[in-house]
Each structure stands twice: as structure tokens, then as C-alpha cells.
Amino acid sequence: MKVYGVNELRKMYLDFFESKGHLKLNSFSLVPQNDKSLLLINSGMAPLKPYFTGQEIPPKKRVTTCQKCIRTGDIENIGKTARHGTFFEMLGNFSFGDYFKHEAIAWSWEFLTEVVGLSGDRLYPSIYLEDDEAFDIWNKEVGIAPERIFRMGKADNFWEHGAGPCGPCSEIYYDRGEKYGCGDPNCTVGCECDRFIEVWNNVFTQFNSDGNGNYEELENKNIDTGMGLERLAVVVQDVDTLFDIDTMKAIRDHVCKMANAEYKVDPKKDMSIRLITDHIRSVTFMTSDGIIPSNEGRGYVLRRLLRRAARHGRLLGIQGKFLAELSKTVIAESKDGYPELEEKKEYILKVLTIEEEKFNKTIDQGLSILSEMEEALVSNGTKTLNGEDAFKLYDTYGFPLDLTKEILEEKGFSIDEEGFKKAMQVQRETARSARAVTNYMGADASIYDEIDPAITSNFVGYDRTSHTSKISVLTTETDLTDEVVGGQTATIIVDETPFYATMGGQTADIGFIVGKDAEFEVEDTIKLKGGRVGHLGTVTKGSFKVGETVTLTIDTQKRQAIGKNHSATHLLQKALRNVLGSHVEQAGSFVTSERLRFDFTHFSALTKEEIAKVEAMVNEEIAKNVPVVTDVMSVEDAKKSGAMALFGEKYGDSVRVVTMGDFSKELCGGTHVANTGSITVFKILSEAGIAAGVRRIEAITSNAVFEYYKSMEEELHEAAKVAKTEPASLVKRIESLQEELKTALSENEKLKAKLANNSLGDVMNQVVEVKGVKLLASKVTDADMNGLRNLGDQLKEKLGECVILLASASEDKVNLIAMATDGAMAKGAHAGNLIKEVAVLVGGGGGGRPNMAQAGGKNPSGIDAAIEKAVSVVENQIK
């Protein structure tokens, strides 16, 4: 049997099924598209679910793919055994109501035996025990003896996932030989050893299950085939494990080289070598698909894999950053099948480098602290690290909980995970209040810590702009107090408030609080610990006391402007996902009354066309003037409704879902307009990158857009005035001025050439002969570098074989150029070396080729000395 590489096998498979009428599709992204049931694509069928369910019409009834997949369910076993991996490629051929069992079985056999060249005697099919149709196809059509066809039960050979389409499977096993067996003479298909390995699985989707054991025959039957590319390579290449196939071995060998280690010598090192080899594939492909390291969702999976690999690199003794360098091998080995890896290489390496740098800055100190904690556990006779200590490692030293857990488990310890969660919650509350306080005149957090925990504030501002309530707390900048008077800066807390505190990227309301003969200007509104809302500002009239009833009124004009910009961010996010893809996720936002800022995950700058599409899409939704509807529901109901939520965000029992027609639906606690038409118009001002894989858009809406265009119009009129034309004719006027400038520059060049020609006769008299070679070293007036070059070319034509050095000065700038003909160079002349020696005399430097070189300087007074020195330099050069 011929041995094929992974890249060859991938191509052979796709080409084979393309020859059978299948549409060959590129691998889908690891980021699921419109599938909230998956964090990452984990099978070949996963991206095609809409075609199987009928939600979407497939591009063709026959499709074949090689799908990149990530599975981290058994991440703890990666490296410990040679069987497990997080990244794999799944080969698949699919039929959507077209061919069925006969073709699927026949083609699987044909590919394995005739294309790949596996021996039919070593292949064993399995079928669902009641699937007589599949048995007859294998037996009568393919020619497999009955005793070599294995009937198995539902657990092994029937694909079913709750209610819905389902069906029997037919797998194909390959006998790798006794050397991979368990030693049992009765070892056969189904044994847990490594001898009989499943290489192919045909799923025959022919029933619809009601979930209660009742099955109805489907009118349109489907084929879902899966074959692990790496597993096929293990069989074809006859190697022990997936870490020995050609592409994996290349990565494994690179790891060994970096660590100066040999594989299969030290079991502990082998574990780290395998783990790094696997994880670097995952992080390379995940980063390529726009996932960036973070503390939530897919980003957390990436960060966890990357940091595990980095730590095991240290265990192997690899010094400094190494993951980006190792990723180059992954890209080199996989770019045939995934050319986007090469296209995004610079981006991938940058993301990996930045993340590894972050980790390296904290890991040494963190490991030292963890070691001290381990010693304390031993001395205290306990096996469990408390949650506060685990959180300290996470919060201070950047150790993910999983990493701390993994390190401790290696040494027989565990972690109090509930205690960790409680410590994190405490930190979040503290951070919120600290941030809020810092935003207000540097007030001390202890002021707010002294407030009775039983005191709360209720926000009532969704449907009102003014409200009457009772003062529950008053503070100055330094103390809790019962009264504040005119001129004092203070914080007022009431039972109920229409003022929105800064949260979720939306800036706070401002306004006034009015009491009996008293006024307070609210300059900021902050969220405090315990759900309290602080109104920060200045007493402008009278005094306020705790217990008094006051009227709170927000600045409605500012609230409306904020609402327009906030609603626009929802439309913007949806438009970005529609135009760029569902990998786009919110990475931050900032909404004020003047403008909005939206940060999102994306791996490249937006083109002008993409920006225009996004802007047009948002304005189209604004023009529809659909109601902005807010519903309060449970988190589960919100998710079922398809509302977008931020990864990792904590929500209460009930949430607010903001819906804008059939275009946008998001979980959001902010304030919005009543209908999209109120936004009036939307304009993107800028788009730029702010971090690896994160872009930022700044935009304006409503009156700000009109002001923007008004300003632009004024600038246009001013420009037209300067150009002495009308705005409508400005483009033509600029084009005309450009032509005039071009003509003037051309005339200028002609004049320079004329001056150079006039200089030609003057300098010809300065030619000297040095060891049989003509040398012309001269000063020229009113010539730039281009003029010197043109003059030099003309002199060469007149002089024949020669060496030329020309110098020109303009104010405090000197230009030098040297030239040598072929004949002069044959005798040893070198223009570059000539320039190098004389340029120092004019306060400059330079060099170049033997035939031509140039330099600049800042000392015109040295020109004469430079010209004089040329003779001795050339004299030394000529042989």
C-alpha cells in the first residue's frame, strides 16, 4: 500500500466525491453561524444543520467537505494519552434528499480500497442490528462475507438526538494487526484495544423520532458521513498514534527541537510534548477564525489552550516566547488545505505573541505564590486550596482557575470552586463601587461603605423623566451627613430615581433635584454597591436633609440624544454581523449624547465598501421607523427568543429584551428611543483597530450628523473660495490646478536641464586623468539630486570611460553623486566607496553600487575638500 500524507489524503477524498457529483465546499469557520447550541464547531455535520433541518436550501443536494473541528470535553486527557486531541479535521460527504445507502456504502468501499489502497481483507463493516437493507448491500453488492459484517445495538450504530431526524449507522473498521492488539486471541471489532480502529461512519437519516420511541419514515432521506482525517492517516501511514502522522510529527519534532528533548524517552516530557503539539494546532486555527483570547466563551477556550501550552513549554525547559514560532510550522503544514492560514499569518502570530507575553509577565510570580500555598496545605494537613487563595492567583497573577486546578491535581490537591466564585463576586462589587467613586472628584470609597446595607434605590426612569422620592442618604466628599447646604459638593441617594447611572457603556443622566426652596445640580449618576444609585453634584440653592421629599428631573434633551445613540449601537452590531459575519461580537461600547463608540471582534480593517454597506443597512432600518419594543422575561425565555447576550455577563432572574422589528433583538438594560425613526440618520466617522482582533467604530446620529455635514459644507465653501471657484466646480478646479502644477514642474525641469547643459561646458574643462582613467570631480550650482543624475549621464556620454563626482549645495543641504563606467570599474573604480570617503567631509554619509552612488550632507563649506579628495581616493582604487 502506498503511503499518503495528510494533505494528499484530504485532496484525494474531496476530489473523489467531487467526481461523484458532489459540490466541494471549503471548511466552515470554527465559530458557529447562527447556532447558539454550540460554542465551537465540533463535527463535520454541525455547520450543515440548516440544510438537514430544511431551514435553508443547500447549494447542491450533494456536498463534500473537510471540516476543521474543536472538542475540549476531554481536555484533561490531552497529552496524558496519545489518543486524544482537541483539534481534528472531519471528512464528510452529504446527501440532502438525493442518494442513500447503496451509493454511500459503495463509494465508501471504493474510496478506501481503490483510491487509498487499503486491503479489503482488513476492513470490517458494522451495521445496526435491525438494518437488513444495509446488511444486504454489504453482503450482496460489495461482497463482504456475512461473518465479517457486525450487527450492533442502538448505542453503537443508531444516531439519535432526542426528537427529530435520526437513523441507523454503518461503520467501517480497519484491522491494524496483532502488534496493536490486546493479546486476546478472540480480539475483534468492538474491542477497546487499538487493533480494530473505526475509520468511516455512514449515518442513514431515514426516520423522524417523536422522542417517545416512535419512528416515522422520512420522505426525504439524508446521508451524513464522517471520517476523521487524522485517524485515516494513522491507518494509511501505519503509525502508532495521531502524534506520529506526518503533519503532527513535524510539529512534534519542532517542539522537541525547541526543548532539546527526545520523544518517547521520558513519559513526563512526552505528555508535555503531545499537549503542546495538539494545543498549538487549536490555537492557530481558532485565532485564524477571528477568536481572540478573553475570559469569556470561545475566547476563554482559546486562552486556556494557549496558556496550558505555554506552561508545558516551561516544564520542558523552553525559555521565553515560543508559541508564535511553533505556529509557523502549523501554518506551513496546513496551508495547502487552509490557505487562509498563510493569509492571516501575521495576525495569528501577533495574537499568540501578545497573549504569551501577558502570561509570561505573571506566571513566574504566580507559580512561586502557588508553591507557597502548596507548602501551607501540606503543613496544615489539608488537600483543598480555599477559594480566596485560588481567586488571588486568578485576580493578581492572571492564573485561570482551570490552570491552578490542573497544577494542583498533578500533585494530589483540589480547589474550593464555590469559594472561588464567591470571592469573584465580592471583587466585582468592590470594583464597581471603586470605579464609580473614582469618577467623582476622587472621593474615598469608605464614604459609601458606611451606608446602611439595607438602603437601596429603585430605578423608575424607563417610562418617566421626573419623579418624587425621599432622600435616604446624604454624603459630602468626606463624610455621611444629615444635611448639605449651598455651595457644597455632595452625593444624594433616594428611594426611587428616574436617573440612569453609568452602566453597560451608556453614560449617566444629568439634571436637577428640587426640594423646598432648594436646588441641586446633578452632574453625574453612579451605580453603587447594593443596588444604590448616587446622584453626584452641587447644592446651588438652599439645603437638603435626610428624609425630605424631593423631585428629581432628568435633562430630557440629553436622555433623548443618548437613547438615539444607544439604539443605533444595536442596529450597528446587527449590521456588522450581517456584513462581516457572525464572528462579530461586542467587545465594548461607550454611548454619550454626542456620539457612540462600538468595539467589536474582527480580524481586519473594514473596506470602504463594507463601511458603506453597514452604514446603509443601519439607515435603512432607521427609515423603516419600526417601534423599539422592550419586554421583560426570564433569561431562558430571552435566549429561546433569539436575543443576543454578552458572553460571561451575569443576568438576574428577569431581563429586558430590546427588539427593533425583525432586525435586532438584544438583552439590554439601557434606555432607548420609542421607534427607530427617532434616530433620524446614522453616520460612521471612523473605523480603526484598537487591539489584536478588536476594531472600533465611532459614529454620530440625528442632529450631530446635520452639524457634521454643515461643518463639512462650510469647509467646502472655504476651499472653493481659496481655489477661486464655486463648490460645484471645485473638483474640476482642483484637476485644472493639478495640470497647471504639472506643467509648471515640467517647465522647471526643462530650465534645470538647460542650466545643467550650460554647466556642461564649464565642468568639461575640469577633467583630469588618474592612472589612465578620466576623472571629473566638480561643483555644480542650482541642481538637486535628480539634476545631478541627469548631468552625470550626459557627462558619461561625452567622456566615455570615466569616473564622475558631482556636488551641489542648496542653503544648508549638500547633494553628492558618483558614477563609474564599466571600463573604469574594470580597473578598480568603485562609486560607492568613493562616495563613502568624501561624504564625511560635507557632514554626511552614503554609499551605493560600484557604478552609481549618492549621499547627502549638511556642511556646504566642505564641498571643495570633498572634490579635492576625489583624486586621491580614485588613485588608490585604480590598480
Curated annotation (Swiss-Prot):
The alphabetical list of record keywords is: Aminoacyl-tRNA synthetase, ATP-binding, Cytoplasm, Ligase, Metal-binding, Nucleotide-binding, Protein biosynthesis, RNA-binding, tRNA-binding, Zinc
Provide the protein's localization: Cytoplasm
Highest taxon listed in the record's lineage = Bacteria
PROSITE patterns attached here?
AA_TRNA_LIGASE_II_ALA (PS50860)
Task: Tell me the GO molecular function terms.
Answer: alanine-tRNA ligase activity; aminoacyl-tRNA deacylase activity; ATP binding; catalytic activity, acting on a protein; transferase activity; tRNA binding; zinc ion binding
Where is it predominantly found?
cytoplasm
- Stored SUPFAM superfamilies: Class II aaRS and biotin synthetases (SSF55681), Putative anticodon-binding domain of alanyl-tRNA synthetase (AlaRS) (SSF101353), ThrRS/AlaRS common domain (SSF55186), Translation proteins (SSF50447)
Q: What does the note under cofactor report?
A: Binds 1 zinc ion per subunit.
Q: Which intervals of the chain form a coiled coil?
A: none
Xref: Gene3D superfamilies: 2.40.30.130, 3.10.310.40, 3.30.54.20, 6.10.250.550, Bira Bifunctional Protein, Domain 2 (3.30.930.10), Threonyl-trna Synthetase, Chain A, domain 2 (3.30.980.10)
Pfam families linked to this entry: DHHA1 (PF02272), tRNA-synt_2c (PF01411), tRNA_SAD (PF07973)
Q: Which CDD domains match?
A: AlaRS_core (cd00673)
Gene Ontology CC annotations of this record: cytosol
What is the required cofactor set for this protein? Zn(2+)
Recorded E.C. number(s)? Answer: 6.1.1.7
Its recorded reaction(s) are:
tRNA(Ala) + L-alanine + ATP = L-alanyl-tRNA(Ala) + AMP + diphosphate
Q: Where does Zn(2+) bind?
A: H566, H570, C668, H672
Q: Name one GO biological process term.
A: alanyl-tRNA aminoacylation
Mind telling me which NCBIfam families this protein's record contains? alaS
User: Into which family does the record put it?
Assistant: Belongs to the class-II aminoacyl-tRNA synthetase family.
**According to its UniProt entry, what is the function of this protein?**
Catalyzes the attachment of alanine to tRNA(Ala) in a two-step reaction: alanine is first activated by ATP to form Ala-AMP and then transferred to the acceptor end of tRNA(Ala). Also edits incorrectly charged Ser-tRNA(Ala) and Gly-tRNA(Ala) via its editing domain.
* Entry remark concerning the domains of this protein: Consists of three domains; the N-terminal catalytic domain, the editing domain and the C-terminal C-Ala domain. The editing domain removes incorrectly charged amino acids, while the C-Ala domain, along with tRNA(Ala), serves as a bridge to cooperatively bring together the editing and aminoacylation centers thus stimulating deacylation of misacylated tRNAs.
Protein name, per record: Alanine--tRNA ligase 1
Q: What is the scientific name of the source organism?
A: Lachnoclostridium phytofermentans (strain ATCC 700394 / DSM 18823 / ISDg)
> Where is the organism placed in the taxonomic lineage, from the top?
Bacteria, Bacillati, Bacillota, Clostridia, Lachnospirales
> Gene that codes for this?
alaS1
